[in-house]
Curated annotation (Swiss-Prot):
It holds the Pfam family DUF1328. Its main location: membrane. The chain crosses the membrane at residues 6-26, 28-47. InterPro entries: DUF1328. Belongs to the UPF0391 family. The keyword Flavoprotein does not apply. It comes from the Bacteria. It comes from Psychrobacter arcticus (strain DSM 17307 / VKM B-2377 / 273-4). It is found in: Cell membrane. This is UPF0391 membrane protein Psyc_0130.
């Protein structure tokens, strides 16, 4: 999931450099959502493993 977040972040950066603001914003939102979801799942897995 971290890989997909990085891919969408790179797409957002490339799109912003090329002037595609809508695509850059959408890709940045996807990257943020995927990164947040991955961190939450990591924390849940870490806590459930320790108990």
């Amino acid at each position: 999931m971290f890989r997909w977040a990085i891919i969408f972040a790179v797409i957002a950066l490339l799109a912003s450099f090329l002037g595609f603001g809508g695509v850059a914003g959408l890709s940045a939102n996807f990257a943020y959502i995927l990164l947040a979801l991955a961190v939450i799942l990591f924390i849940v897995a870490f806590v459930s493993r320790r108990t």
